[in-house]
Amino acid sequence: RMYNTNDIHTVLTMIERDSNGLVKEKKTEVRPSYTSVEDDMIDLRVMPLRNYALTSYLQSRGVDIGIATTFCKEIHYTLRNKKYFAIAFPNKSGGFEVRNPYYKGCIKNKDVSVFYHTNGMTQEHICVFEGFMDFLSYMTLRKKGNTEICVDGMVDVLVMNSVANLRKSMDYLEPYKEIHCYLDNDIAGQKTVETFIGLFGGKVKDESARYREYKDLNDLLRGKKR
């Protein structure tokens, strides 16, 4: 037990506190910076994902475009008299995780994203991802028939969109027989999995060992070892 308590409220409060103060690993790759744009944003338009620059970016990350267009949208907006566009991944609160090669952020409310294999039905198994790029990477690997990484059979999916959304994830995870966690191989990912184990016990399966040589599923997809 990481937090020496069985009280769920106490555990959630502690993990949310810790997720805001985790030491970040050093990276040699330039990653998009996180920013919030909603307050100064105007002329917001959401449309099917077709922009060549965005689809090329996803292809550079190894993501199958057919999968990307199934789960993602394209968003355009004006910010401080300049026009921008990005990939938009919808969440349960009607908001979007937005990303392009230069930044990532959130428009409207921050929340988890959930996808059910069969509409109106819950499967016995669910796969949990930290961000939508990892989810798209997993679906790409699944399409390629990769059985070393992917779970067999029908599964539902929860994308946390941030480890700080652990509390919001709980209600969705409770009904499942097995919870397969495909989180990052870093401190934040490890703590989140350990917290899930503390809350849900043996139902939680830490799948990060399947890609232990990589930071996350997208790095695995691209063959980029740590």
Give the predicted meaning of each segment:
Residues 5, 63-64, 126:
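Helix N-cap/coil-helix junction residues
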Residues 77-172:
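Phosphate-handling DNA/RNA-contact segment within nucleic-acid enzymes
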Residues 1-57:
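Non-catalytic accessory segments of DNA primases and related replication-initiation nucleases
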